[in-house]
Amino acid sequence: MVTFFTKNDGKVSAIAKGAKRPKSKFSGTLEPFQKIAIDYSGRTSLKTLKSSECIEPFKEFCTRKNLYSAFYVNELINCMVKSNEDPIEIFNLYEQCILQLYDDSDTNKVLRNFEFNMMKVLGYEINFQSDYRSGDPLDANSFYTYAPQMGFTISDSGYGGEQLIEIREKKFSKENLELAKQIIKQTLDFYFEELNINSRSFFR
């Protein structure tokens, strides 16, 4: 079974009969990160793959970390996106992210931008604008605690308001990227309890 993410139909799972045979008609076209044109049929959620043609062949990533980051993006898409999601915006975000990962050495920045954008598209956007209790704008001189689904609220200790404002403005220092990663993971773990991202182990 192969899972595709398509621009028009979103996430599609299909059986590629005979794909493992040496002279399979699918040979060389079902590798990760290749842009391909596919034809499939079937009335159920599990389709039958009829043909696949490579449009853009696999390109080597500049580092192993970039490759692992791309696998992480694939797993995130597969876990977060449902079959009935509107695919076009997600497809464009995914394609842009993979293209950046081919050559960009700052994988943390690429991944955090992708995660934030994906959560916004899927309805899980984090509110870095205001305190969810009072409605007041985040204050650079205050501290905040964070609760997924609710947001940030002022506290005696916790995340610094200045850092949160910088993250909102995409001012990604090394420290801000690490904090953004922590907040995103907390959010994803809350909404997707069974989110099992195997490629996370590559970054430990």
Residue ranges and their predicted role:
Residues 1-3:
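Short aromatic-glycine-enriched beta-strand elements
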Residues 5-204:
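Non-catalytic alpha-helical scaffolds and adjoining flexible linkers that form interface surfaces
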